[in-house]
Every structure is written in structure tokens, then in C-alpha cells.
Amino acid sequence: NVTMETIQNRVAANRLAGNYTWVFLDEIYLFFKYYYSAQFLYKCWKRFRKYGAAMTGATQNVEECLRSDTARLMFANSEFLVLLNQAATDRAELARLLNISETQMGHVTGAEAGHGLLRIGGSIVPFANEFPRSGELYRLWSTTPGDK
């Protein structure tokens, strides 16, 4: 895939130039639909930090990711996860996979926007990221179409 090779080439070029790269993949579940892209992503997920890069994946619904053994390995081996509101089936799978208690999962059950759980290494912390809705920063950061 041209896109994946372009990402890899950019990370390599930035490393040579002494620049840090942050690769952000929205709708990451799409990478797990096909064997080649899933394997590529897994390789990058494990190696890019050695090349001065960080990988971030985002998806609305993790159920599609959790159907992939490769994605499950990536979730389980990630040192930093942000969990926002989750569907019931997703909560159950994530709780099992990540060893998160039912009480802790309560923070991603019917959670308001910007509320959830942070999993950092072996620690799990609830958070509420509330930001004033007025102002330019909110407008820039908001992913809600009506807020633009």
C-alpha cells in the first residue's frame, strides 16, 4: 500500500533529519481488515519508537479491532490508552483483555464527551477533560461538526 510505505519513508527521513514523528491513524480498524495492512501496522507499532516516532490509533468502536488477534496484541502491549464511552460489548472485551475492573469500567459507561479512563503502564485513572466551549481553542479541537 502506497500510504503505508509513505508513512514508513517519512518516519525514516525524519529520523535522519533528527525530527520526531507522530503518526496519527484515525479509524484504525480499517487497517485490520486486511492481512498485509495489519502486519505492517503491527510492525510499525513495535518499531517506530526506536526510530523517534510515536503511533496513535483512534476508532469510534473497538469491537471491530478486537476481532483481530494482531489488534488485541497491540492493545495489550500498549503503554498508554485513552478509553472514552464504550458500548457494552466493547466494555466486556476490553475489561477482560486489559484486566480492568467493573468499577473502573463504570467510567466508560455512558460517559460524557471528554470523560473516561487513562491506562498508563499498570495504572488506570479516571479523567474528566472539560474545556470551556467558548473560544478559538475549543473550536479548533472539537470533533463535533456543529461546533465548527
Which residues does each predicted region cover?
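Conserved P-loop NTPase motor module
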Residues: 1-13, 17, 82, 110-148
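Conserved P-loop NTPase motor cores
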Residues: 1-108, 133
